Curated annotation (Swiss-Prot):
The keyword S-adenosyl-L-methionine applies. This is Uncharacterized RNA methyltransferase ZMO1179. Keywords: 4Fe-4S, Iron, Iron-sulfur, Metal-binding, Methyltransferase, S-adenosyl-L-methionine, Transferase. The keyword Thylakoid does not apply. InterPro entries: MeTrfase_TrmA_AS (IPR030390), SAM-dependent_MTases_sf (IPR029063), U5_MeTrfase_fam (IPR010280). Its EC number is 2.1.1.-. The active site is at 354 (nucleophile). Gene3D superfamilies: 2.40.50.1070, Vaccinia Virus protein VP39. [4Fe-4S] cluster binds at residues 47, 53, 56, 131. S-adenosyl-L-methionine binds at residues 235, 262, 282, 328. Belongs to the class I-like SAM-binding methyltransferase superfamily. RNA M5U methyltransferase family. It comes from Zymomonas mobilis subsp. mobilis (strain ATCC 31821 / ZM4 / CP4). GO terms for biological process: methylation; RNA processing. PROSITE patterns: SAM_MT_RNA_M5U, TRMA_1.
Length: 397
């Protein structure tokens, strides 16, 4: 018998002698004939689709194991950069049924419509009838789409579905071919109104066309309603967003003049009280316009610039003006911007990341330039998945 001692980065259990054992957790045992004996941390998956659906990976791990797994993912990323693991705070997990945005797919073969997620490591679809990840209103809206797609999705056609729980209700974008007929147009309006959708848009490959919007669709950030553009980035759960905002505000402290780089719609920029002055830079035009409008209407001291920080990162003479700099880049990290931050003589950096590998890479650049990493807070917004968000505080005296 061999004991499972840890989880590897892809979620497989690992024994002391390095054997990888799928679907196992620490304190499980694997016998010589391959039979797995469950330990105290191995629990029953909560979804009937688990093991087939690719939406979740670790439903059989209890909360203690899952928190340790997310924390270890960050520590391992630092080890890969030949760095000591940072001070890691206890991971925060968003609860089940809390996801407020989702991407699904639907395919019609003959008269059969399949709607759901991809199977694990496959392009095949799993037809879902439940999902413990999603807010119940979001899941209901996804199921409501079945009848609409059954009629209007052409045979052998694929629909990409993006859904967000906005302030006014469900914002739905369907990427699919759609008939340009009066009947089809009226069907969209009737369906969206009947099901109470806030907005329903179609993209046939030529850009997003809003076909139904009963009122301006917004998402509230920092108590400020912000117009929600199509494809805009939004934290996966409100709970996760609140945790990230809390940690960022704690790290920013009493800094008065703050930069928010890769600001998006203003998750952090709009969270501060009016006594702080915030410069926000973002490369997505629609997000910039939405943030500008929201900040102005709320009377927030937020200056917003449309700026591609990969091609035109802030330079040293621009950065030295700020008492604290927040970064929240996409998965690729902020290599170009970090190079300019590293050479600053002093300051405070709050780095929010969704990728341990690029976070550790960028942290190495800062650490080698004399910055100190005080702590990292892991945040699990995607229950039972391999993904982890994190906030880290760097200072240089």
């Amino acid at each position: 018998m061999k004991k499972i001692i840890r989880l590897a980065s892809k979620g497989d259990g690992v024994t002391e002698d390095g054997q990888f054992v799928p679907n196992s957790v620490p304190d499980d045992y694997i016998s010589d004939d391959g039979k797995l004996e469950f330990g105290a941390h191995h629990i029953e998956p909560v979804c009937r689709h688990f093991s087939v659906c690719g939406g979740c990976r670790l439903q059989y791990a209890d909360e203690e194991v899952y928190k340790n797994f997310l924390t270890d993912r960050i520590a391992e990323a630092f080890h890969q950069q030949a760095l000591s693991a940072p001070v890691l705070k206890t991971a925060h997990l968003s609860p089940p049924y809390s996801r407020r945005r989702v991407a699904l797919r639907a395919f019609k073969a003959g008269k059969k419509l399949t709607l759901g997620y991809n199977k694990t490591s496959s392009h095949q679809l799993v037809d879902i009838v439940e999902c413990p990840l999603l807010d119940k209103n979001l899941f209901k809206a996804a199921m409501d789409l079945r009848s609409f797609l059954q009629k209007w999705l052409a045979p052998r056609s694929l629909a990409q579905i993006e859904m967000t729980l906005a302030d006014q209700g469900i914002d739905c974008l369907l990427v699919m071919p759609f008939p340009e007929t009066l009947e089809a147009t009226e069907a969209i309006t009737a369906f969206a109104a009947e099901k109470g959708f806030a907005r329903l848009s179609i993209d046939q490959g030529y850009g997003v066309e809003t076909r139904w919007e009963s009122e301006r669709v917004t998402v509230t950030l920092g108590a400020v309603p912000v117009t929600l553009p199509a494809h805009a980035f939004l934290q996966a759960t409100k709970d996760g967003e609140q945790t990230l905002v809390h940690m960022v505000k704690e790290a920013v402290g009493d800094a008065h003049f703050v930069a928010d780089l890769f600001s998006g719609l203003g998750t952090f920029a709009l969270s501060f009280e009016k006594d702080k002055r915030v410069y926000a830079a973002e490369g997505m035009r629609d997000a910039v316009l939405a943030l500008k409008q929201a900040a102005a209407l709320a009377g927030k001291a937020v200056f917003v610039e449309h700026r591609d920080l990969f091609r035109r990162p802030l330079q040293k003479d621009e950065l030295v003006r700020f008492e604290c700099i927040i970064l929240d880049p996409p998965r690729a990290g902020a290599k170009e911007q970090i190079a300019n931050l590293a050479i600053l003589p002093n300051g405070r950096i709050v780095y929010v990341s969704c990728n341990p590998a690029t976070f550790a890479r960028d942290a190495k650049t800062l650490l080698e330039a004399g910055w100190v990493l005080h702590w990292v807070k892991p945040v699990g917004q995607f229950p039972w998945s391999l993904h982890v968000e994190m906030v880290g505080l760097f200072t240089k005296m």
